[in-house]
Design a protein with these regions (language model features):
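Nucleotide-sugar donor-binding patch of glycosyltransferase catalytic domains
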Residues: 213-296
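Short, aromatic/basic amphipathic alpha-helical patches
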Residues: 40-52, 174-180, 232-234
């Protein structure tokens, strides 16, 4: 099974379909393998219970007649539209990722359950029971929330919680731009353990925040107005920015790659917001804190 794209979060939101295929394969005495579209997806696959293994998309061989390949990109709902775009909403309405993938799964004949997340395998980390973790880093510069907002949010939360931010590497000396104690998670498995063990998570719309949601950890996602990746469950809330302006929408449309099925040799380039992320900059720490209090 190949997920909807190459990001860590793209695999996480695809998990209900992966898990349904694993359950079906087990009943039939077969195996389910993941076709990983990035190294981070391959590393996270080790935490998916029942998965037989993982193969890199770049090295994926042609399948034999008895094998079945489910490629979630190979569907008109994916190929013909950029999710969250005005054209998409005009055709389908304001669908979120669970509703989109449920339709794709149904067309593939897969009975996937999107009613609640089934957590990844994890090992508890001691000492995080009263810790709120902040997910501030993202590979997409168009999704950045200002450091001053994160520091203000951390200050408000410290009155009641231990507060740390998840980082993929340890900061060196004075190179750390954010004055919040760091919790390094050097690989996806370590991130799963930390995000499963903490009191809650407030994070930008990125892979680690999606992992927290998958682990049923109370999570507030800070996202752009048109993001479809928020998953609406009782333990989740979304703090959405203002609608994107015309320049931002045009830049996003120009960088869309939804018409590609295979991502072999695809070179993704981070998209920079031409408007300086004004939509997220207007969001206030107090708003995030209030949403988090709804989940306590």
């Amino acid at each position: 099974m190949a997920p909807i794209s190459f990001g860590l979060g793209d695999l996480v939101v695809s998990l209900p379909i992966v898990q349904a295929l694993i359950a079906d394969s087990r009943r039939r005495g077969d195996e389910t393998w993941l076709v990983a579209r990035s190294s981070s997806q391959a590393r996270l696959s080790e935490r998916i219970p029942g998965l037989a293994g993982c193969v890199d998309e770049e090295a994926f061989p042609p399948v034999s007649g008895a094998d079945r390949v489910v490629d979630l990109r190979d569907h008109p709902l994916q190929r013909d539209y950029w999710w969250g775009s005005p054209e998409f909403e005009a055709t389908f309405g304001p669908l979120y990722i669970n509703e989109i993938l449920e339709r794709i799964a149904s067309d593939f004949g897969i009975e996937a359950d999107f009613s609640a997340p089934t957590p990844l395998l994890s090992s508890p980390l001691p000492g995080l029971g009263r810790t709120v973790l902040l997910v501030t880093e993202t590979d997409g510069p168009a999704k950045v929330w200002p450091a001053t907002k994160w520091e203000s949010l951390a200050g408000q939360l410290r009155q009641r919680f231990d507060v740390r931010r998840v980082t993929r590497t340890a900061a060196i000396g004075d190179l750390d731009p954010l004055d919040v104690p760091a919790l390094p998670v050097p690989n996806p498995g370590a991130a799963v353990d930390a995000l499963s063990s903490c009191r809650g998570v407030i994070g930008i719309d990125t892979g680690l925040t999606h992992i927290a949601v998958q682990q049923q950890t109370p999570t507030v996602t800070i996202c752009r107005h048109g993001s479809v990746y928020f998953r609406r469950w009782s333990h989740t809330r979304a703090l959405r920015g203002a609608p994107c302006d015309a320049a931002c929408s045009a830049e996003e449309r120009a960088s869309a790659y939804n018409d590609r099925v295979s991502l072999r040799d695809f070179q993704w380039r981070p998209r920079t917001c031409p408007s300086g992320q004004r939509c997220l900059a207007e969001l206030q720490p107090e708003q995030a804190a209030r949403l988090f209090d709804e989940l306590r």
